[in-house]
Structure formats: structure tokens, C-alpha cells
């Protein structure tokens, strides 16, 4: 029986043993390993953007111009992180910033034409990345996994 099979048995049947603490059986460790695998697959397909940069472009594609803070909320990033992401995308000419017409303190972010072209080109690759990440799972397992992850998020 493989280590993965043992873990599944532990999770599905027995529950954790209070006497032992094995890192490889902890949810955070397993999530981190799965995340590392996904990021590696992402980098192999889209090497010139980070997943947070891609997320920002994809969300801007969906919602259009929005405030920097709202974009951060929409893509689950704190203000400092989203600012860094936007700064790097702006330096590459993929997004542009403007001041809000009424509240000049608010910065609005939007895709440039180059940013729109980039995200439209990358969306099919993102679908491939998701499919490759979920390859070890059957279609039913993948659907269950996504539903359970969404519940945890």
C-alpha cells in the first residue's frame, strides 16, 4: 500500500491518531504540495507571468476597470500584494492606472490593449493548466475536489 493510499485510509476511515502527528498527513502540508504542483504546471505553460499576475488580468477581463482595492478583494489579495502585482503589470504595459473622477485618491486599474490581447491568448492555456493539475483525478473526483476546495475557501 502506498503512502498516498495510507493517507486516504487515514482520512476516510480511521480519522487522525491523537498519539501521532505526521506532517505529511496534515491538511496544510497536503494543500501546499498540491499548490506547488499546480504552480509548477502553471510556470511550464505560462512562464512569463505569475499566477497572481494572471489572476489580476483575468479578473480585469471579467469586470473591466475597477479600483485597485476592489481588484485585490476580487482576487483574494491584500492591498500591498495587489499593488506590487499591478506595478509589475503596468511596467510591462499590460495594465494602466488612472485616478477616479470624483475621489482623486482612488486609483483605477484597467487592461491596456496589449493586456487584453495577452489574457485572451492565455485563457486557453489556463484551461489546460487546470486540466493538467486535475489529471490524477477522475472527472467525478475532480468535481468533488473542486466543490470541497470551494467549501474550504
Regions found by a protein language model. Give the residues of each.
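Short, locally clustered residues in the helix-turn-helix/winged-helix DNA-binding domain
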Residues: 32-35, 58-62, 123, 150
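Short alpha-helical elements of helix-turn-helix
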Residues: 25-29, 36, 49-58, 69, ...
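Short glycine/proline-centered loop/turn elements that form peptide/ligand docking sites
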Residues: 46-50, 81-84, 88, 138
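The alpha-helix within a helix-turn-helix
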Residues: 72
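Charged, amphipathic alpha-helical coiled-coil/dimerization segments
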Residues: 39, 65, 87-150
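N-terminal leader segment of winged-helix/HTH proteins
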Residues: 1-48, 111
Amino acid at each position: 500500500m502506498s503512502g498516498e493510499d495510507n493517507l486516504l485510509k487515514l482520512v476516510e476511515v480511521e480519522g487522525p491518531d491523537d498519539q501521532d502527528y505526521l506532517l505529511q498527513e496534515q491538511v496544510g502540508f497536503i494543500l501546499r504540495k498540491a499548490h506547488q504542483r499546480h504552480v509548477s504546471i502553471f510556470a511550464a505553460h505560462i512562464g512569463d507571468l505569475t499566477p497572481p499576475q494572471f489572476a489580476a488580468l483575468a479578473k480585469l477581463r471579467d469586470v473591466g476597470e475597477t479600483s485597485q482595492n476592489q481588484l485585490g478583494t476580487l482576487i483574494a489579495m491584500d492591498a500591498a500584494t495587489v499593488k506590487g502585482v499591478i506595478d509589475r503589470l503596468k511596467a510591462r504595459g499590460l495594465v494602466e492606472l488612472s485616478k477616479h473622477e470624483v475621489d482623486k485618491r482612488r486609483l483605477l486599474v484597467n487592461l491596456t490593449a496589449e493586456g487584453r490581447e495577452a489574457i485572451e491568448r492565455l485563457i486557453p492555456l489556463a484551461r489546460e493548466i487546470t486540466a493538467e493539475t486535475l489529471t490524477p483525478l477522475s472527472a467525478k473526483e475532480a468535481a468533488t475536489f473542486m466543490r470541497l476546495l470551494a467549501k474550504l475557501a
